[in-house]
């Protein structure tokens, strides 16, 4: 198992030149067309980074109501349009999403408002 981990680490750390050499060896000596595999290995890390940077929708998660629970319940009621009973239940059952799939600017504004009211909030 340790050998496979070492191999995987070496494979991930290959330079572009080394990946191309590996592709040539696989094609010439073993008849394997590694084009798709080479793209996956070379582009795998970059794709994950780009995806994180391009996130456009966020979930606003209430992790804890904080010290001023009443103010947080009122604000959640106002922000979500829920009734008082439902807003209180949402706050009591934290961590819970307050809003899901909102734009970054709106998510940050909601987070700021909730934190101002004393709540602990995170964006996902």
UniProtKB/Swiss-Prot annotation:
Origin species: Christiangramia forsetii (strain DSM 17595 / CGMCC 1.15422 / KT0803) (Gramella forsetii)
Phylogenetic classification of the source organism: Bacteria, Pseudomonadati, Bacteroidota, Flavobacteriia, Flavobacteriales
InterPro entries (UniProt xref): Ribosomal_bL12, Ribosomal_bL12_C, Ribosomal_bL12_C/ClpS-like, Ribosomal_bL12_oligo, Ribosomal_bL12_oligo_N_sf
Top-level taxon: Bacteria
UniProt keywords, alphabetically: Ribonucleoprotein, Ribosomal protein
Family under the similarity heading: Belongs to the bacterial ribosomal protein bL12 family.
Assembly, per entry: Homodimer. Part of the ribosomal stalk of the 50S ribosomal subunit. Forms a multimeric L10(L12)X complex, where L10 forms an elongated spine to which 2 to 4 L12 dimers bind in a sequential fashion. Binds GTP-bound translation factors.
One Gene Ontology cellular component annotation held by this UniProt entry: cytosolic large ribosomal subunit
GO terms of molecular function: mRNA binding; structural constituent of ribosome
Listed PANTHER family: 39S RIBOSOMAL PROTEIN L12 (PTHR45987), LARGE RIBOSOMAL SUBUNIT PROTEIN BL12M (PTHR45987:SF4)
Gene3D superfamilies: 3.30.1390.10, Single helix bin (1.20.5.710)
A biological process from GO: translation
Protein name (Swiss-Prot/TrEMBL): Large ribosomal subunit protein bL12
NCBIfam families: L12 (TIGR00855)
Known function: Forms part of the ribosomal stalk which helps the ribosome interact with GTP-bound translation factors. Is thus essential for accurate translation.
